[in-house]
């Protein structure tokens, strides 16, 4: 054993054990801590690398430690590990090994009142006792001394566990475990016991004013954890309680998604609060030290900045201030496996913004915000200042403002950035410590004291610790310019540095009210890398995009899903029998992230036996999993279809876990025996196998109104852009998916036919508040023409689901994708409120979905519920102008440069046709209108998986390409299917330019989009009449796509964006981009760049008008090198997963389609 006790020396003495190289206590140096700094623990020893451990934390298990029987033990079946917190007055606990019979646990003194809480979600700093930071002062004379001793032990013969129950010859305090400073007296291999787990102390990791951190082994597992043992000194008791309360609040959030360190439990040991955290690898300060404090390239700073800004965004949304952000408190998770994956640690100084006190000592000095130094009121913005100092230190390799005192700190800031504003200095309570007011001037101004004046007043000598002295922050761009870059790479580096300095200046704004926020930081071009799109062929740019892959969300966010009040409402009835077989791949038995079962409570109603357990936690992570959600008959809003059978049974071949999006909990398992029963016949059921994890988190269905996600009050009073920015989806590499909603519609399913359900997710922007309120009220009886999905971007590294980010100005209408089984089948379906029919009478339309496992086809009949379709079907042209705002813009593509069938040579003329023989048609030649007042919307078309065949999609043909001068009009589209059209136009190859269009008033018409989801086979377009035929684009869905969205907020860009054709936008409205990566050499793929055009309508290609709720969803097929602009490279992002088909829900119906259960193989070299 190696007990630890506090000596009185001013340095650390080390008595090495027998194995010197394995000791965690060697090579520690003098600890320098600033006086009265709560958490200014700095520096690490040379052996600072910590072992990483498995992130799969099993559920809590009841401890077999003998404890007083009056203590209640928490239920081990709860989804989170439970915590027992003993009040500080209860004395201490003497613990034994797991099965020791020689010693019994006793609780000494104090009542037995216990507080149980859930897992906490952050790890505080793993700081080694050692390596001083430059210019830090120390006044604490205590030190740590390690002595090799062998105290009396109790050996358990049965289990072999050893517990040290006696102590050393050193004197201890009356607390029986603490010294005079309140630090716990550590004993190596000592056992720390919570109510659920037992931990053995392995190494001493570090200590600070908060206490100390030890590396422990969780007995019975192979997990290594870090336990933070807080001091029990009265002066730290209050802050310890605050830290525990903040960790308890953060325990409800996703630590991985928001880049917090996960904490497992909290317990009391010998009157000391112990916090158990996951073990991380290395902090950024050690990382810099390991690299000899060399500057870090911007391509590595960017992912660190993005992840920490995401953490600050979540803290800001919770009203929390970290208050001690610095390189030591940013930990690398696993540098070898996940380069530059970081998490924020140490919430010992954190507080709620409402409880912030101006005189409170906060933040380490180098990273201390001016408002703290001057004694001004502060808020979460102090963390953004600290983050700016951190990224500047990473860029320089040395602290930007390494002040040895607060005077030096404000002096450095003022010399580089200028004096704080006069109103700030006048309001500061500590201003007079560093500034003098010039009373001789008629306008008294503040003047910084000279170093001599300050030394004369305080006796503190000013020091110069800066490595770089800048007259302004812009001078930083000239530091450490790399010389090994040539050509475009050098231009990329210079552009990157300009954006970095621009962001840094906004983060280091002295006035906190004007300082950039975390969400704005995540939308800054430096983070989104929009400025790098000008250099698509640069290897440096490719490397930048690859490094940002680590910033993707691990799972889709579940917090915004819970805001959805609309459940999945779709009437499903079997067509020929009462049996429906659900077939799943055996691959679907893996749970990548263990979520909470709480969000599934609304779905797991009667007739839905669900069982929690741990059997479904598999060792092999499988991102290609699906989940089955079975909604019981008791689900509200599921009326039976009167013409169909009333019920059916469900059989499953193997158990499939239901995965929701709350990490750390257990999955739900549907047992086959329970699902094989026949359900009651009073109502129909929904079987929604969500096609990847975006659909697995189901919101609590407290209301069954067919309404949009955003409540009426919010839609009418709050700008949607602000509402969306309050969530974490300001990050475009860690996007958030809200729960989509399938709208009402009767769908007929055949017997014994495997099916999956997908929903095309769309997003809307806030229209005028009156418009939103009016539309919400107008469609309140049946919100069938309102999409209830609010989505920014959906991306998950644990799922092959690729993101679709859609930007719109008004609530969107759902787009519908149709499919046909053979060349002779012509399928039509109503779009929006317009029923597609051969005659003016309402009739059912069929959608035939061939499924690979079955030779038969599924016929889905879709009909409307009310007379709205009929009324709108006969609506005159005059009503269209009111409805055109509900139309979503789409991508257009040519068949070939010479295949334009229009007799009008003007590229901006509009040709209009009406439907004929039940076929919805649309023909626009890309009108550019100035007078249109309709708000444009865009939808990013989802790509198809490789198992799906070529898709025939009717799309608007654009005349001569609206070019920005970067590209020609000879972009070829590859297609493997031969298609014949009655107009005689071959669509084997097509060319065109992507355009942004708005709606234009015009005659009432409809559109058809037949889609073939079966194997590749020729198709024939439906017969049409009219002098002009619309061009047809054929999609060969064989490319995997890694879509990213890049907001473009730069006001300096002109109306026409250089990257895209005819892009008109406002500075406040970001552009959206989608990147693709080819899966193999010569493979074809789908790329869609859809940008909501803002501002000038002259650069906007517009639709002719058609009824509300029609959505154009047009994929564009292009080769690997064929993109709308040569400035956009097709392979900025390496593809990880193949595409699957997205299906959107229309107001009157819902389309189902089959998903391939196995992902397509991706080329190892996506950039070839």
Swiss-Prot record:
Q: Which residues carry this modification: Phosphotyrosine?
A: 361
Q: Where is this region: Interaction with DAZAP2?
A: 595-772
Spell out where the chain crosses the membrane: none
Q: Where is this region: Interaction with DAXX?
A: 189-520
Query: Where are the residues of the annotated region Localization to nuclear speckles?
Result: 845-952
Any single GO molecular-function term of the entry would be: protein serine/threonine kinase activity
Q: Where is this region: Interaction with POU4F1?
A: 724-869
Sites of the modification Phosphoserine? 16, 118, 135, 441, 607, 641, 787, 799, 906, 963, 1014, 1125, 1158
Where is there biased composition of kind Polar residues? 765-791, 910-923
According to the entry, every stretch annotated as the Protein kinase domain falls at: 199-527
Transit peptide among keywords: no
Q: Where in the cell is it found?
A: Nucleus, PML body; Cytoplasm
**Protein function:** Serine/threonine-protein kinase involved in transcription regulation, p53/TP53-mediated cellular apoptosis and regulation of the cell cycle. Acts as a corepressor of several transcription factors, including SMAD1 and POU4F1/Brn3a and probably NK homeodomain transcription factors. Phosphorylates PDX1, ATF1, PML, p53/TP53, CREB1, CTBP1, CBX4, RUNX1, EP300, CTNNB1, HMGA1, ZBTB4 and DAZAP2. Inhibits cell growth and promotes apoptosis through the activation of p53/TP53 both at the transcription level and at the protein level (by phosphorylation and indirect acetylation).
Name assigned to this protein? Homeodomain-interacting protein kinase 2
Give the organism the record lists: Mesocricetus auratus
């Amino acid at each position: 054993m190696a007990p630890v006790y506090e000596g009185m020396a001013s340095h650390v003495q080390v008595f090495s054990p027998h194995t010197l190289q394995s000791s965690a206590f060697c090579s520690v140096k003098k600890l320098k801590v600033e006086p009265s700094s709560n958490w200014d623990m700095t520096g690490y020893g040379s052996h600072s690398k910590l072992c990483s451990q498995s992130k799969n934390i099993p559920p809590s298990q009841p401890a077999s430690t003998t404890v007083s029987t009056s203590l209640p033990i928490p239920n081990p079946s709860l989804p989170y590990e439970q915590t027992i917190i003993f009040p500080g007055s209860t004395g201490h606990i003497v613990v034994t090994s797991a099965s020791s019979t020689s010693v019994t646990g006793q609780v000494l003194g104090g009542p037995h009142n216990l507080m149980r809480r859930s897992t906490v979600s952050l790890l505080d700093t793993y700081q080694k006792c050692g390596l001083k930071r430059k210019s830090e002062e120390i006044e604490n004379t205590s030190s740590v001394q390690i002595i090799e001793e062998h105290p009396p032990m109790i050996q358990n013969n049965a289990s072999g566990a050893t517990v040290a129950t006696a102590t050393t010859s050193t004197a201890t305090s009356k607390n029986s475990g603490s010294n005079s400073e309140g630090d716990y007296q550590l004993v190596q291999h000592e056992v720390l016991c919570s109510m659920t787990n037992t931990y053995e102390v392995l190494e001493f990791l570090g200590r600070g004013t908060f206490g100390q951190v030890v590396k422990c082994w969780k007995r019975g597992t192979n997990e290594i954890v870090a336990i933070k043992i807080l001091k029990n000194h009265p002066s730290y008791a209050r802050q310890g309680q605050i830290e525990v309360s903040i960790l308890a609040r953060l325990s409800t959030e996703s630590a991985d998604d928001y880049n917090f360190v996960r904490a497992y439990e909290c317990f009391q040991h010998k009157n000391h609060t112990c916090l158990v955290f996951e073990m991380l690898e290395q902090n950024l300060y050690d990382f810099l030290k390991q690299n000899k404090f060399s500057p870090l390239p911007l391509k590595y700073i960017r992912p660190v900045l993005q992840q920490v800004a995401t953490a600050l965004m979540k803290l800001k949304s919770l009203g929390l201030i970290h208050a001690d952000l610095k390189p030591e408190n940013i930990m690398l998770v696993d540098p070898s496996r996940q380069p530059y994956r970081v998490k924020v640690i140490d919430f010992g100084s954190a507080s709620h913004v409402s409880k912030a006190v101006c005189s409170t000592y906060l933040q380490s000095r180098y990273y201390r915000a001016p408002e703290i130094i001057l004694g001004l009121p502060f808020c979460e913005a102090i963390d953004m200042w600290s983050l700016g100092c951190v990224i500047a230190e990473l860029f320089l390799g040395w602290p930007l403002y390494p002040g040895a005192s607060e005077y030096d700190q404000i002096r450095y800031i003022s010399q580089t950035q200028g004096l704080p504003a006069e109103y700030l200095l006048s309001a500061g309570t500590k201003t007079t410590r560093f500034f003098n007011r010039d009373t001789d001037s008629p306008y008294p101004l503040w003047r910084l004291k000279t170093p001599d004046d300050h030394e004369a007043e305080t006796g503190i000598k000013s020091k110069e610790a800066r490595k770089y002295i800048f007259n302004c922050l812009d001078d930083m761009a000239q530091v450490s310019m790399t010389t090994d870059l040539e050509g475009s790479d050098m231009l990329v580096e210079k552009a990157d540095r300009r954006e970095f300095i621009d962001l840094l200046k906004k983060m280091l704004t002295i006035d906190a009210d004007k300082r950039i926020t975390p969400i704005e930081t995540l939308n800054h071009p430096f983070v989104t890398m929009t400025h790098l799109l000008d250099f698509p062929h640069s290897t440096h740019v490719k490397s930048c995009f690859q490094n940002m892959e680590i910033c993707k969300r691990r799972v889709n966010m579940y917090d915004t899903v819970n805001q959805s009040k609309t459940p999945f409402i779709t009437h499903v009835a079997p067509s020929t029998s009462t049996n429906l077989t659900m077939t799943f791949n055996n691959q679907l038995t893996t749970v990548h992230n263990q979520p909470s079962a709480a969000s599934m409570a609304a779905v797991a109603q009667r007739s839905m036996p669900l069982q929690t357990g741990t059997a479904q936690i598999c060792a092999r992570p499988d991102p290609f999993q699906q989940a089955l959600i079975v909604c019981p008959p008791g689900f509200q809003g599921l009326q039976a279809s009167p013409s169909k059978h009333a019920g059916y049974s469900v059989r499953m071949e193997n158990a499939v876990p239901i995965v929701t999006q709350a990490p750390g909990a257990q999955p739900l398992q549907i047992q086959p025996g329970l699902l094989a029963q026949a359900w009651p016949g009073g109502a129909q059921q929904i079987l929604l196998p969500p096609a990847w994890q975006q659909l697995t988190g189901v919101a609590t269905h407290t209301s069954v109104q067919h309404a949009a996600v955003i409540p009426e009050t919010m839609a009418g009073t709050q700008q949607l852009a602000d509402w969306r920015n309050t969530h974490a989806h300001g990050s475009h590499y860690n996007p958030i998916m809200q729960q989509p909603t399938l709208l009402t519609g009767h769908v007929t399913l055949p017997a014994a036919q495997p099916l999956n359900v997908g929903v095309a997710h769309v997003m809307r922007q806030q229209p005028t508040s009156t418009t939103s309120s009016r539309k919400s009220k107008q469609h309140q009886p049946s919100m069938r023409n309102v999409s209830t999905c609010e989505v920014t971007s959906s991306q998950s590294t644990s799922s092959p689901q690729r993101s679709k980010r859609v930007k719109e100005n008004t609530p969107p209408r759902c787009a519908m994708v149709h499919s046909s089984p053979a060349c002779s089948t012509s399928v039509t379906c109503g779009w929006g409120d317009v029923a597609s029919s051969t005659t003016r009478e309402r009739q059912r339309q069929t959608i035939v979905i061939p499924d690979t496992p079955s030779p038969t086809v599924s016929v889905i009949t879709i009909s409307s519920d009310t007379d709205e379709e009929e009324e709108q079907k006969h609506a005159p042209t005059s009503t269209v102008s009111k409805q055109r705002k509900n139309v979503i813009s789409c991508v257009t593509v040519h068949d070939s440069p010479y295949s334009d069938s229009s007799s009008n040579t003007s590229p901006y003329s509009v040709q209009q046709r009406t439907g004929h023989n039940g076929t919805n048609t649309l023909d626009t030649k890309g009108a550019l209108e100035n007078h249109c007042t309709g708000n444009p919307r865009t939808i990013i078309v989802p790509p198809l998986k490789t198992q799906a065949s070529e898709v025939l999609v009717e799309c608007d043909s654009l005349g001569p390409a609206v070019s920005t001068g970067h590209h020609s009009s000879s972009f070829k589209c590859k297609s493997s299917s031969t298609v014949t059209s009655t107009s005689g136009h071959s669509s084997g190859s097509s060319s065109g330019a992507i355009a942004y269009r708005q709606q234009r008033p015009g005659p009432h018409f409809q559109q058809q989009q037949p889609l073939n989801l079966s194997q590749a086979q020729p198709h024939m377009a439906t017969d049409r009449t009219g002098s002009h035929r619309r061009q047809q684009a054929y999609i060969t869905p064989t490319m995997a796509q890694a879509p990213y969205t890049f907001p473009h907020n730069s006001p300096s860009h002109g109306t026409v964006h250089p990257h895209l054709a005819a892009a008109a936008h406002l500075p406040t409205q970001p552009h959206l981009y989608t990147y693709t990566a080819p899966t193999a050499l010569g493979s074809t793929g789908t790329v869609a760049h859809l940008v909501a055009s803002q501002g000038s309508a002259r650069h906007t290609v517009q639709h002719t008008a058609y009824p509300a709720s029609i959505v154009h969803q047009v994929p564009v097929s292009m080769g690997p090198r064929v993109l709308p602009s040569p400035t956009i490279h097709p392979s900025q992002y390496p593809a990880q997963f193949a595409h699957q088909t997205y299906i959107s829900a229309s107001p009157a119906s819902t389309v189902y389609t089959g998903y391939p259960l196995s992902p397509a193989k991706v080329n190892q070299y996506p950039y070839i």
